[in-house]
Amino acid sequence: MFPMITGFMNYGQQTVRAARYIGQSFAITLSHTNRLPVTIQYPYEKSITSERFRGRIHFEFDKCIACEVCVRVCPIDLPVVDWKLETDIRKKRLLNYSIDFGICIFCGNCVEYCPTNCLSMTEEYELSTYDRHELNYNQIALGRLPISVIEDYTIQTNNYELNSYKKMTDKPLDSEKITN
């Protein structure tokens, strides 16, 4: 008879212990309901980047002296610098500069070691595309600073030239006007 009573007592103790654990976990859950959310709603809210954030590289074509220091310090030899030696003035003339951001590891060595400070890191971090070849930026694309990280409703594109071109191409060609 005693083993049966001790079994009931053990069962009762285990039940009380389980109820206490459930109560503690419920109290923790309730304490989290008063907190503000940690995550942000990404497409609608953008996270504020830090001052030392290493985003897309900005390139200033006029400052570059084609010394290729950026290529030498890059761990993956990524920047492509095309230049031509001007024999009459004995200086290099930069022809083309490009970086493939699909391969870039954003280490910032090229920016740090550039002697003319023609490279800088921007706060732009949205570089995703459906085609990886679109991530190969030339000097024109690298020279553009982002207007805004988000689409601003105050900035509107001028589609006047595009619409007038479409109107011209929609008309069928008249062979008499072309020959006369």
UniProtKB/Swiss-Prot annotation:
It is an enzyme of class 7 (translocase). Residues 55-84, 95-124 form the 4Fe-4S ferredoxin-type domain. It catalyses: a plastoquinone + NADH + (n+1) H(+)(in) = a plastoquinol + NAD(+) + n H(+)(out); a plastoquinone + NADPH + (n+1) H(+)(in) = a plastoquinol + NADP(+) + n H(+)(out). The keyword tRNA-binding does not apply. InterPro entries: 4Fe4S_Fe-S-bd, 4Fe4S_Fe_S_CS, NADH_quinone_OxRdtase_chainI, NDHI. Binds 2 [4Fe-4S] clusters per subunit. Its EC number is 7.1.1.-. [4Fe-4S] cluster 2 binds at residues 74, 104, 107, 110. GO terms for molecular function: 4 iron, 4 sulfur cluster binding; iron ion binding; NADH dehydrogenase (ubiquinone) activity; quinone binding. Keywords: 4Fe-4S, Chloroplast, Iron, Iron-sulfur, Membrane, Metal-binding, NAD, NADP, Plastid, Plastoquinone, Quinone, Repeat, Thylakoid, Translocase. GO terms for cellular component: chloroplast thylakoid membrane. PROSITE patterns: 4FE4S_FER_1, 4FE4S_FER_2. It is a peripheral membrane protein. Pfam families: Fer4. It comes from the Eukaryota. Its cofactor is [4Fe-4S] cluster. Belongs to the complex I 23 kDa subunit family. PANTHER family: NAD(P)H-QUINONE OXIDOREDUCTASE SUBUNIT I, CHLOROPLASTIC. NDH is composed of at least 16 different subunits, 5 of which are encoded in the nucleus. NCBIfam families: ndhI, NuoI, PRK05888.1-3. This is NAD(P)H-quinone oxidoreductase subunit I, chloroplastic.
